[in-house]
UniProtKB/Swiss-Prot annotation:
Subcellular location: Cytoplasm
UniProt cross-references to NCBIfam families, sorted A to Z: PRK10984.1 (NF008217)
Residue ranges of the region described as Essential for activity: 99-122
Phylogenetic lineage: Bacteria, Pseudomonadati, Pseudomonadota, Gammaproteobacteria, Enterobacterales
Main location (coarse class): cytoplasm
Originating organism: Yersinia pseudotuberculosis serotype O:1b (strain IP 31758)
Annotated Gene Ontology cellular component terms: cytoplasm
Name of this chain's protein: Sigma factor-binding protein Crl
Length: 133
């Protein structure tokens, strides 16, 4: 499958996977890509399958010469679902912002290497973290 960006999906998936453990292939559909990060474990004493995490997720789609994205910060619960939530702990917030900015920069650089831009989606007005200048 070739996306509207004229780049084959299989090659993009390989490039996205090379960015690290962020790509969730099972949640990528057609021209919709899903990335996430389980940045901070809430309780390490629980069995792994019962743990919850603070983190973030990004969804992106191709559009003429660019990818647009939306992202959220929140809780990855023990059922394996993301819920957008306000982060009250400043240390957790800092960790989420740091990992999100780091990933965003690497994603932006990777897309630039194939002559694509990375931009917020037109309807994404409530950005909790400023990712680029």
């Amino acid at each position: 499958m070739t996306l509207t960006s004229a780049h084959p999906k299989s090659k993009l998936m390989k490039r996205f996977a090379a960015l690290g453990p962020y790509l969730r292939e099972g949640q990528c559909q057609n021209d919709h890509f899903f990335f996430d990060c389980l940045a901070v474990c809430i309780n390490v004493k629980l069995a792994p399958e019962k743990r919850e995490f603070w983190g973030w997720w990004i969804e992106q789609e191709p559009s003429a010469g660019r990818f647009t994205y939306v992202y959220q910060l929140g809780l990855f619960n023990k059922e394996g679902n993301w819920n957008a939530e306000k982060i009250s702990d400043p240390e957790v917030q800092d960790k989420l912002e740091s990992t999100l900015r780091s990933f965003h920069l690497r994603l932006e650089e990777m897309l630039a290497s194939i002559d694509m831009k990375l931009e917020p989606a037109a309807d994404f007005n409530d950005q909790p973290v400023k990712l680029s200048a």
